[in-house]
Curated annotation (Swiss-Prot):
It is an enzyme of class 4 (lyase). HAMAP family: RibB. The lineage of its organism: Bacteria, Pseudomonadati, Pseudomonadota, Gammaproteobacteria, Pasteurellales. Pfam families: DHBP_synthase. Keywords: Lyase, Magnesium, Manganese, Metal-binding, Riboflavin biosynthesis. It comes from Haemophilus influenzae (strain PittEE). This is 3,4-dihydroxy-2-butanone 4-phosphate synthase.
Length: 215
């Protein structure tokens, strides 16, 4: 990727990651780009612990509509969330579990407020499987152990960022789309970030940062 296009968000991987961590600490979203040879997409990511209905509404409005809750394997086991399919043959092995809905406190489950309630229910310290109904309107994703050092995906990036910011290891993500419904690529993501004031970093930035600091 041409790094100069990302210079408004930091001249080095370290700067971009630190800016993103700081944004997360303040409960703000960040935009994460993956490799151009992979999905070549940008996801808007919020810490699950602090996401608001207003932020969820932005994900729904500007994203693909598939809002995902990225969580650890340990959390998936705590909630008894099996994989969506027995044999995952998707290109990037995206680890969807069955979809979820909060058992209490929601109406249809599809509104921004309802999806936030579902997320808050799922990441509660004392959450148990019966706190959730299946299926639902939130799509959990199981992050690979080791984060982006194991798998260079948006799922792992969101969990890593949450951990580095001092939050529970859970992030809420959605792919950003253009007004015509096509996927937003790097130039589109940069313009989107400038318009709304988001930090931008790449998954490779996060890999480089973690390796440099052994974290």
């Amino acid at each position: 990727m041409n790094q100069s296009i990302l210079s408004p968000f930091g001249n080095t991987a370290e700067e971009r990651v630190l800016n993103a961590i700081n944004a997360f600490k303040n409960g703000n979203g960040v935009l994460v780009l993956d490799d151009e040879d992979r999905e070549n997409e940008g996801d808007l990511i919020f810490p699950a612990e602090t996401i608001t209905p207003e932020q969820m509404a932005k994900l729904i409005r500007y994203g693909s509509g598939i809002v995902c809750l990225c969580i650890t394997d340990e959390r998936c086991q705590q909630l008894d969330l099996p994989s969506m399919v027995e044999h995952n043959n998707s290109v990037n092995k995206t680890a969807f579990t069955v979809t979820i809905e909060a058992a209490k406190g929601v109406s249809t489950g599809v509104s921004a407020a309802d999806r936030v309630t579902t997320i808050q229910t799922a990441i509660a310290d004392n959450a148990v499987p019966t706190d959730l109904h299946r299926p639902g309107h939130v799509f959990p994703l199981r992050a690979a152990n080791g984060g982006v050092l194991t798998r260079r995906g948006h799922t792992e990036a969101s969990v890593d960022l949450a951990r580095l910011a001092g939050f529970k290891e859970a992030g809420v993500i959605c792919e950003i789309t253009n007004d015509d419904g096509t996927m937003a690529r790097t130039p589109d993501i940069v313009e989107f970030a400038k318009k709304f004031g988001y930090s931008v970093l790449t998954i490779e930035d996060l890999v480089e940062y973690r390796l440099a600091h052994n974290i």
